[in-house]
């Protein structure tokens, strides 16, 4: 269950670090709304959204992106392990209490964004799907599962159907590379040589703290 709060980059939601406790999504989205009147937190004709792993690094960024991209949210529910359950996250000026994913009623959710690590995704994603939600999973749990579709929206979103209840999100390096390479397929690609530099956050919050001890001041 500790994976529910582990921090990592969006393509590596399997981080082995400790939880970023009591995170606030609104901190990540500071200034995104710009000047003028505040946008409404929720819209009547929007989508009922859940973020699983909401107090971790990736979960907080997911909350921020929902705000920054003006996603039409009808309701927002935040889930974590029992360790962070009960904490309060502020999103668009609204205080939202984080729920214990192991005990919560999962009904009424349209889309569930999982940023909780592979173990948590394997355990809880099917339960969210069975309750009626479409799950978008950031971990490696379903990437190699032949029954699940691995989707990069800019490339192959058209493969999705109403029957797809758990959608796998590729590794972050894969996404960046294929968005650039997809238009070149028509020319015929024989071989690709790739060098990547991975973020330390892919290992988790603990690794970030360890790196700080190695920096020269």
Language model features with spans:
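N-terminal Rossmann-like NAD(P) cofactor-binding subdomain of oxidoreductases
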Residues: 2-12, 22-217
